[in-house]
Amino acid sequence: MATSGDGFFLLKVVDELRGPSRYYRDSVPSSSHPVSPAAGFPLYQFFAPGGLLSKKHPAYEFRRGQLQMSQAVEEALEEKRHLIVEAGTGTGKTLAYLLPVIRSGKRVIISTGTKNLQEQLFFKDVPALERALFPEGDRKLSVCYMKGRNNYLCRKKLFDLTDQPVLSGLEEIEHYRAIAAWEKTTQTGDRAELAELPEASALWYKLDARADTCLGQKCKEWERCFITEMRRRAAESDIIIVNHHLFFADLSIKLEADGAPDAGVLPECGSVIFDEAHELEEIAGNYFGISVSNLRMDELTRDVEHLLQREKLYTPQISGAIQSVRERSQLFFSLLPANEGRFAFDSRREFLEENGEEFLALNQSLYRLGAELEQLPQKPEEVFTLTRRAQQLQVQLRFVMESEDPNTVFWIERRGFRGAPGALARQKSSEEKRAGARTNIFLQATPIEVGQILRECLWSKLETSVLTSATLAVGGGFDYIRQRLGLDHARELIVASHFDYESQAILYVPPDLPDPRTPQFAAEAAGIVRRLLEITRGRAFVLFTSYAQMNEIFERLLGQLKFSMLKQGDAPKSALLEEFRVTPNAVLFGTSSFWQGVDVQGQQLSCVIIDRLPFAVPSDPVVAARVKAIDAGGGNAFFEYQVPSAVITLKQGFGRLIRSLHDRGLLALLDNRILKKQYGRVFVESLPNYAKTTDIKKVEEFFGADVG
């Protein structure tokens, strides 16, 4: 969810839509000359057997679908059109869009779903194409790789800390020494270079270059700033590789700033490729929303205190203002409904009737803090940033509590997992780790329909967009993704996978298991999971739609399997994946974070078991609001939204298994509603052409050559 400086006010959407675009334009030429060796030949000569790619890369295999997709992308760029492409796993979609991008002679942003895919593009795919296009090494592609601002060091913050140390504990002192030494040598300021720095480092949060603490061009380190340097590299590049979070954070900042020239970090660009485009609705919704929390209140008062201590600007008046925000915030958030997790805040009006004085008192305390900061006689530039943050919190709090915007759902999320079981307790965000053990409370405002915003703020401003993923189509069409994203006019293409799914994979659905929603399901499902794992000799992901189901079945199987059992929550995701890869016959039990973006090739992963059709939790406030809006508009939310969303998630989960031509294995779905319910046909028709069975003996036969 967007936070201070990362989102734009939903209240301003209509005004923003009326204005001309100042952040995208029809065509931005390449900063260098078009790549003539690429532009001088038809695409077929690159991809064909005996073509340029196969000559430079002996392991390259011709894939007709890859050529087909590449031609479609080239046409979209040439004809200034939008394009939606589902490219099955193994298509080679990154090369399929990279080559026409290079040939186009235009500046193009490539936005990916994950940092891992960014790294693959920048460190593997682009260099491979470069070697093929320029075998003599006489030319270089102009490419840059950008992450979110919080990945980069703020030199000013580091130097301020050097002058006025505010460190807590030996660990922070060690981290400070490592960062200070690294700052002298790094060219990028990217924290990924600091392998020894923990992901949840509290010190890094004090030193990162996030937008809400940035002084911009008024900063004395502006010229040497790593963000400034990143902007320069991007402005000089033809291909800019980002991730969806950075792209939409940047877009929301530009919308909020009304096109101010120094807003955001991405340069003007008329063409964008969205890889892993099935994630766009959720991510865009987060950045087009608002989040106000007790954590943000605490961070504001803490940052004000640190500045005043450093600059010796403390006055009794401002000390009182800080204390007032703290006390009023603590009281206000303690009065909010005490439900756990995510829940709709439908009782805002009743809440304000009962607690209006406390709400107004918190607003007034934020106003007073901003006013006291403005009254300081000597104001370093940081004061203006802090004043803006106080004012922004005040306005956002009023919006979340008072707005009647019909396209917005208002809800509350409690994080901190007080009293939660171990696996849940470890799934904390970096914000929560900074705040300690207490519960953090987030007041959220999220757009119900992202499509309207994207239609007006993005698609209508771009010359060309290409949306691609292995999981975009539902039932052989793109109606769902087009409607959810507001992309009314786009060419469509489905490229079949290069894999022979019918011989490489078998899909097994147990015919007699109870409904997954019943209490009897877990015990019987555990028995089926055990038998399947014995057939496959482990080597499996067992994926769940809930932590509770995962924990129950894991506990039932403990001591019954001879294979190493790994469970999400017992270690960081990266450590679990590495242990899975190096442990023969391991079984990994996981939830949503293992359903996508995970790649384990070869026999080590020979089985993926999914507990149930992955329908979104109907009580989730955002899901419930979208369902209500569709039904109120005369639609059928179950078939128009809930089923298609679950289809795409299921395709993602099953997509973990077959990652190469040599992979082979079992897909098991422990939910026979796919066979018994009318809507099950939509799932079946959307999946690849796996061999299918309800007979477990067929599974044994499939693995017959492997079973000793």
Protein language model features and the residues they cover:
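A substrate-engagement module of RecA-like helicase motors
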Residues: L10-L17, Y23, P29-H57, K106-D238, ...
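Conserved pre-motif I regulatory segment
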Residues: P37-I84
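Walker A/P-loop NTP-binding motif
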Residues: E74-E75, T94-R107, K124-A128
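Walker A/P-loop
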Residues: E79-Y97
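Signature of the SF2 helicase/ATPase Hel1-core->accessory helical subdomain module
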Residues: R103, N116-E119, F123, P127, ...
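A contiguous, basic/glycine-rich beta-loop/short-helix subdomain that forms a polymer-engagement track
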Residues: Y205-I240, A249-D262, L369-L513, Q520-G527, ...
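Conserved RecA-like P-loop NTPase helicase motor core
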Residues: P510-Q520, D570-L675
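Conserved helicase motor "Helicase C" RecA-like lobe of SF1/SF2 P-loop NTPases
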Residues: T545-G569
